[in-house]
Amino acid sequence: VMQWLMFQMGGVGPMQGQANVFHRYAPEKIPYAIDRYQKECTRLYEVLNNRLADNEYLAGDYSIADMATWPWISGHKWSGLSIECLPHLTRWFEQIAKRKAVIIGKDIPDEMEAGTGKSKVDVIRDFVI
């Protein structure tokens, strides 16, 4: 469990975060940065896909490693990426998305943009840039 949690903390989270920022939020599009972080995310997705070929979850049973990794993978489209060609990662992603706690956790009210006159994307952009 710790190995896969550290994989998320040291790889998936930081790289996915950078891919999201440069692809979606940065005021200036920097092709080198977008390409670099998208390629690294793709590599990390492939590692996860290979692991999930023989395991239902990252560490065998559902664990904090899955809980910490899933939200980052859920942002793949925000980074201009797809997981469709990775069948094991896609299966894992969809399986976790159906969990009751995930469904409840994703039900975020629109209070984030209340009173700002800005969209959620603009509020997030102001926060991350």
Description of each model-found segment:
Residues 13-18, 107, 117-118:
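Short aromatic-enriched loop/helix-cap "lid" or pocket-rim segments at secondary-structure transitions
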Residues 4-100:
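GST-like fold's C-terminal all-alpha helical module
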Residues 5, 106-109:
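A general structural motif at alpha-helix termini
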Residues 109-129:
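Acidic/histidine-enriched, glycine/proline-rich intrinsically disordered or flexible terminal extensions
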